[in-house]
Swiss-Prot record:
It comes from Salmonella typhimurium (strain LT2 / SGSC1412 / ATCC 700720). GO terms for cellular component: plasma membrane. The lineage of its organism: Bacteria, Pseudomonadati, Pseudomonadota, Gammaproteobacteria, Enterobacterales. Its main location: membrane. This is Thiamine import ATP-binding protein ThiQ. Disruption phenotype: Insertions in thiBPQ cause a defect in the transport of both thiamine and TPP.
Length: 235
């Protein structure tokens, strides 16, 4: 589904270079120290950064130079990027039509995702009238209503309390399984990664330093465990 072949981003004197393959429906966590290049990797996939070289394939098609708005990708950030002057209904509708002129089918999709997110009763409220968790549900609904096959999460739930964060992670995981979406999620928490992603990638110094089973990473047995401050449980 998603393949990066020597995708290179020139960051000062440190070229970041990524080679990666992710299958359709796979849920993958991206971990690593601060400044390692995790968000850069997502931004290259989303098209917000243009690589100096390399190839990016999605579903077999070359999207290396495709503008972000035309890529089969949706991305959710820690900052939800909701428009404060638009209500929930309108913010979700932007995912379908930037002009907010929706036909009957699009309105049905908008209302269906709002119901699935549990925010159908909030449709006329402005973002400033919502809690942090509710705002992230709206932002996630706007991503999902676009029905793109790849979903990118850049620590969107890190500011939420642990119980709400776990609830949102479970919701995302369930929807991805239901729709067979390919998910890549940047996180600073290996525990969060373990809840949603059987496979993890560790990024260090602009490279993929390790990839494998999240459980192995969490146990401290992986070669990259020490990069994340995880010690082996074996005495």
């Amino acid at each position: 589904m998603l393949k990066l072949i020597d995708i290179t981003w020139l960051y000062h004197h440190l070229p970041m270079r990524f080679t990666l393959a992710v299958e359709r429906g796979e849920q993958v966590a991206i971990l690593g120290p601060s400044g390692a290049g995790k968000s850069t990797l997502l931004n290259l996939i989303a098209g917000f950064l243009a690589p100096a070289s390399g190839t990016l394939l999605i579903a077999g098609d070359d999207h290396t130079l495709t503008p972000p708005s035309r890529r089969p990708v949706s991305m959710l950030f820690q900052e939800n990027n909701l428009f404060s002057h638009l209500n929930v209904q309108q913010n979700i509708g932007l995912g379908l039509n930037p002009g907010l002129t929706l036909n009957a089918s699009q309105r049905e999709k908008r209302d269906a995702i709002a119901h699935q997110m549990g925010i159908e009763s909030l449709m006329t409220r402005l973002p400033g009238e919502l809690s942090g968790g509710q705002r992230q549900r709206v932002a996630l609904a706007r991503c999902l209503v676009r029905e793109q096959p790849v979903l990118l999460l850049d620590e969107p739930f890190s500011a939420l309390d642990p119980a709400l964060r776990q609830e949102m992670l479970t919701l995302v995981s369930d929807i991805c399984r239901e729709r067979q979406l390919t998910l890549l999620m940047v996180s600073h928490s290996v525990e969060d990664a373990a809840r949603i992603a059987p496979r993890s990638i560790v990024v260090a110094d602009g490279r993929i330093a390790w990839q494998g089973k999240t459980d192995e990473l969490l146990s401290g047995q992986a070669s990259a465990s020490a990069l994340l401050g995880i010690k082996s449980h074996i005495l």
